[in-house]
């Protein structure tokens, strides 16, 4: 797949990425399936969970070698953290292990919905930004929280579409669209809850800057095919946004213009 133009690239923290797809690396049926999915999606970044990888043992011995072969920028995350101290410590460890100051900040406040802890998220983001991290916080579509995260020094946000792993798509279209409208110059990556490529296409049509996928791909019957489908959906949605879609209207409008009367009506001989 080719980009719409060489100029239409995703830019985060001053760094450009050729793809607007970010791909998670957890819960694939095999390392080969993960490798095939990365090749199919051609993501701009792949996320890695330090806590999960450290506990994976010998079964995942080839995981990091696989990532090196694909040569895709890594975005470590703080998945599984429930306190500010856990998140900050995990981020610092990830910086040492992966040799990057990029971090996707996850701080879960509820085990049932896996909803982010908004108060802790802001405090953790503040600490990590001061420590030199490029923080991409996983948050909800709450506009006030989003602004507080920006005030804390975050330059891009990752609002959810729906709770992690549900595949429900966009549960609050109004909230996400308002977030996009009110923060027009902030990179926004929709993260979590997307289930099928049409969900990704939809948010890209609304002007979001990218999507992060994991469960929708890794738990598909054929992950590689789904990864490719999502990449195409993202590209289609982005193209539609740039094309400038027509406004929806309440009344019908003929698509073919009518000028004058048909020639066979003009002589009055028609039945």
From Swiss-Prot:
GO terms assigned for molecular function: thiazole synthase activity
Protein's cellular compartments: Cytoplasm
Pathway: Cofactor biosynthesis; thiamine diphosphate biosynthesis
UniProt feature coiled coil, ranges: none
Pfam families noted in UniProt: ThiG
EC number of the protein: 2.8.1.10
InterPro entries, per the entry: Aldolase_TIM, Thiazole_synthase_ThiG, ThiG
Catalytic residue positions: 104 (schiff-base intermediate with dxp)
Binding positions (1-deoxy-D-xylulose 5-phosphate): 165, 192-193, 214-215
Catalysed reactions listed for this entry: [ThiS sulfur-carrier protein]-C-terminal-Gly-aminoethanethioate + 2-iminoacetate + 1-deoxy-D-xylulose 5-phosphate = [ThiS sulfur-carrier protein]-C-terminal Gly-Gly + 2-[(2R,5Z)-2-carboxy-4-methylthiazol-5(2H)-ylidene]ethyl phosphate + 2 H2O + H(+)
Domain of life: Bacteria
Keywords from the UniProt entry: Cytoplasm, Schiff base, Thiamine biosynthesis, Transferase
An annotated GO cellular component: cytoplasm
Keyword Cytoplasm: yes
One biological process term in Gene Ontology: thiamine diphosphate biosynthetic process
Entry's family note: Belongs to the ThiG family.
Its job: Catalyzes the rearrangement of 1-deoxy-D-xylulose 5-phosphate (DXP) to produce the thiazole phosphate moiety of thiamine. Sulfur is provided by the thiocarboxylate moiety of the carrier protein ThiS. In vitro, sulfur can be provided by H(2)S.
PANTHER family: THIAZOLE SYNTHASE
Quaternary state and interactors: Homotetramer. Forms heterodimers with either ThiH or ThiS.
HAMAP family assigned: ThiG
Protein name: Thiazole synthase
Organism whose genome encodes this protein: Burkholderia mallei (strain ATCC 23344)
């Amino acid at each position: 797949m080719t980009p719409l133009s060489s100029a239409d690239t995703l830019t985060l923290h001053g760094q450009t990425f050729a793809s607007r797809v970010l791909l998670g690396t957890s819960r694939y049926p095999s390392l080969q399936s993960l490798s095939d999915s990365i090749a199919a999606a051609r993501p701009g970044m792949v996320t890695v969970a330090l806590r999960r990888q450290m506990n994976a043992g010998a079964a995942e011995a080839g995981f990091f070698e696989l990532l090196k072969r694909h040569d895709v920028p890594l975005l470590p995350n703080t998945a599984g953290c429930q306190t500010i101290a856990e998140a900050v410590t995990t981020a610092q460890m990830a910086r040492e292990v992966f040799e990057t100051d990029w971090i996707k900040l996850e701080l879960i406040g509820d085990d049932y919905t896996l909803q982010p802890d908004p108060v802790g998220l802001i405090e953790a983001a503040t600490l990590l930004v001061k420590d030199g991290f490029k923080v991409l916080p996983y948050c909800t579509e709450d506009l006030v929280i989003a602004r507080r995260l920006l005030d804390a020094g975050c330059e891009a946000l990752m609002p959810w579409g729906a709770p992690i792993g549900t595949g429900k798509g966009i549960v609050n279209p109004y909230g996400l669209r308002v977030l996009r409208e009110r923060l027009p110059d902030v990179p926004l990556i929709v993260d979590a809850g997307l289930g099928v490529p049409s969900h990704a296409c939809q948010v890209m049509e609304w002007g979001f800057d990218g999507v992060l996928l994991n469960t929708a791909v890794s738990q598909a019957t054929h992950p590689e095919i789904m990864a490719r489908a999502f990449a195409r959906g993202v590209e289609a949605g982005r193209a539609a946004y740039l094309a400038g879609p027509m406004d929806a209207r309440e009344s019908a409008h003929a698509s073919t213009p009518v000028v004058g009367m048909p020639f066979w009506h003009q002589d009055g001989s028609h039945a």
